[in-house]
């Protein structure tokens, strides 16, 4: 009997050893669960790879690792992401963005009235909830959930193309302030896109996971999330692998778009003062906006950035340069006349038919100018930071880790403002554009049973939590 047991034990050990050795040569399993960051301005999708423990943020067909959260409706199709962005200026009334601001949210008539005036598309009130009116062959109404579903479908298709297999399960992030209705509406949008949501995770918690803080010895974590259109500041308490969102504050109308607008207003003023006309063609305004965005991105790495945009002017629109700021349209221009810009305009207009001429507007923008135009906005970032410290009954010296999330936190002056306030450098070890999607992908890997095993983030519900907004 003892001999038989010895033989059996040896056989089991042999099988285990063979399995282990074979495992070294077998291809790694394909991820089964995707992680989604459905952002207000941009959205992205990632996966956690078993074996390597690495996260891959999946690009679209053109190599973009995030896509604009925009959906355009035309007579022939519905366009999403960058295709929608290209239609934003030529088809503004049918291009929906910021849908995340409205999903599952109940508005008072006064709140909704204030929101309606901010958008070129029609925002309708349906018993306190929002619907959008768009025209594609006929006038229809679409819900924020439907707009979200089109974005999620695009992300799902990107993941399926990359993985080479169908995808049905996902983990998705939402703002910590989202109530149950907003969370369920987000899940509904995912269901419309053919996705089953295994878990909803708060964006600050996802960011903390991306930075590895779910495994680190820290207690007080401050997450500053500054994207294209919103600022969110969250104070997290970490106990073991559990996160409690202790306080939240922010500004739902402060972000990279506002910084762009300041520079755009400045450039409009330069054009008007020199030529006496304003760009009016939609495609030229679109090119100007694209150029401004590129300048902003370049200034995160360099002290100066060049821009060049070809503009068209009608002969009867040409005027002499205005002699004072009083001749400028007051509702469109900042009044700063900063010396830190070197503008070079074509001396002559190249003539075209029908009395048109073209102007090559070229200029060099300095980082100092960009910072000067936006300094008051940069300082506003500190207001919600001070608020969460007050609500959390903490001094700024008691914060163990300050982490940055969102593309706008790349701006050097913003990092400097935060560093000066806390007296120490914020944690910038993770790409701020990808922090949330990276954390969500890690959680997706955990929920999908991927190995090597990670420490899951457990979120403690805080029913008394309310976000303080400074809009």
UniProtKB/Swiss-Prot annotation:
SUPFAM superfamilies: Actin-like ATPase domain
Function according to Swiss-Prot or TrEMBL: Has peptide-independent ATPase activity.
UniProt GO molecular function: ATP binding; ATP hydrolysis activity; ATP-dependent protein folding chaperone; heat shock protein binding; protein folding chaperone
Protein name: Heat shock 70 kDa protein 13
Family, per entry: Belongs to the heat shock protein 70 family.
Subcellular location: Microsome; Endoplasmic reticulum
GO biological process, one term: chaperone cofactor-dependent protein refolding
Disordered: annotated span: 315-337
Oligomer and partners: Binds UBQLN2.
InterPro entries: ATPase_NBD (IPR043129), Heat_shock_70_CS (IPR018181), Hsp_70_fam (IPR013126), HSPA13 (IPR042048)
Predominant place of localization: other
Signal sequence, renumbered to the chain: 1-22
Record's keyword terms, sorted: ATP-binding, Endoplasmic reticulum, Microsome, Nucleotide-binding, Signal
Annotated source species: Bos taurus (Bovine)
GO CC terms, sorted: cytoplasm; cytosol; endoplasmic reticulum; nucleus; plasma membrane
